[in-house]
């Protein structure tokens, strides 16, 4: 019910870091490389096998692990996956001399031993790795028979960072966020028949778009991307359009196109909740922004965010070819504010007079880092003066170009 939570330590192998350990897998003894660093052993995803009472974790360099949550000891155990050159891995038939669970890059190790995503349902488990996706069928004793798929078997990319089921009346479509390489445009992949055949969707890839997540509203498939939110008819998934996002009712904007998640909430009136690099945004069913929610300390009369301002930082407070900085100031009486920005020689760079009220107590003015001639300003410290009801307030802003 979410009212209480239990904590379990991160999966960590016993043994010498960089060395090898042996582990038992249903009567067979297999070899595994040891990882101890928390960075390489980070957990990216979890799944619950309710029928057999296991929780699975994908741990990058630490591999795929699981524990039985009804067992008092709650000890993590490694779960072997096929090596890169293996199409399958069958219980009781693993070559103990040849098999090596090793997440080092080839030729010494296997990309398929670096898991990112996991999804479990009924008697099947899917595990996405840097080397494709693995479909596992549970045996009655808890062992798993694996089939390994990669680009040679029809995927759009081998780096599977997300596995998202879409339910239809007669079947389940399984979507894969199938990257080709980190932070690069890529296709999407799906199967309607449990992996017998795969369909690659290339439109977003051809437009140079990176997809971070997929989700579903009543009528649409939603793709959260580095170019905003794209949507496709719930029964399609081939043709995609960009969702226009307006300023909210106060005029405040989301200053990024990096959308990492989109969740449909509400019953009578559907609302899409967007997780972005610039806060949480609520979008109505007719695509009007209702509110933008952020967490920051109340403005101390006058401040700038972010500071320092990386004017060309990709993905952060970037829209189009411009970066943006917010000037926040306390304004409970809704006075109209004016900001003058001066360089280190105290020459005025630009005057800003476009305030927006962001709540009952604060207002903001947004600047794109350009001077009155439209040129991006140079590196340096800038002095910013707020004029509010015949009073002056000062703050400093560091700009890194």
Please annotate each region the language model reported.
Residues 1, 66-67, 136, 140, ...:
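Conserved Ser/Thr-centered positions that define the repeating blades of beta-propeller domains
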Residues 4-37, 76-109, 146-156, 203-206, ...:
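Surface-exposed loop and turn segments in beta-propeller and other repeat-based domains
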Residues 54-57, 124-127, 134, 173-176, ...:
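Conserved beta-propeller blade signature
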Residues 62-65, 132-134, 179-184, 228-230, ...:
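Short glycine/acidic-enriched loop and turn motifs that connect beta-strands
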Residues 257-302:
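Blade-level signature of beta-propeller repeat domains, shared across WD40, Kelch, NHL, RCC1
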Residues 297-340:
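Glycine-centered coil/turn sites that cap beta-strands in beta-rich domains
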Residues 348-377, 389-391:
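Glycine-centered tight-turn motifs at strand-turn-strand junctions
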Residues 381-401:
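C-terminal tail/sorting-segment detector
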